[in-house]
C-alpha cells in the first residue's frame, strides 16, 4: 500500500468529510456516517466510514465547491 498523504482535516461541521487522504490514484474519504456530504461525488455511504473516489472526481468536486464559495 502506498503511503497516505493527509490533504485536509476539517471537523467544524456535521456535513461533509473529516479527513481526505491521497493514496495513489484514489482519494480516501473519512466521513460521518449518516450525514450528507457537501458534494455527491465525495458522499460516504450511511453504513460506512471510509470510501474511495478517484482523484479526477475529487478534483471536480473541489473545483465546484471553490466556484460555489466564490459566488457567496
Give the location of each predicted region.
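Short, charged/polar N-terminal "headpieces" of proteins
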Residues: 1-17
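Compositionally biased amphipathic helical and low-complexity segments enriched in hydrophobic
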Residues: 5-8, 23, 70
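A short, structured beta-strand/loop element
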Residues: 13-52
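Mixed-charge, Lys/Arg-enriched low-complexity segments
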Residues: 42-72
Amino acid at each position: 500500500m502506498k503511503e497516505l498523504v493527509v490533504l485536509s482535516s476539517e471537523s467544524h461541521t456535521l456535513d461533509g468529510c473529516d479527513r481526505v487522504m491521497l493514496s495513489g490514484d484514489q482519494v480516501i474519504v473519512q466521513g460521518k456516517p449518516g450525514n450528507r456530504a457537501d458534494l455527491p461525488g465525495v458522499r460516504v455511504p450511511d453504513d460506512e466510514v471510509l470510501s474511495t473516489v478517484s482523484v479526477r472526481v475529487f478534483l471536480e468536486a473541489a473545483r465546484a465547491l471553490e466556484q460555489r464559495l466564490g459566488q457567496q
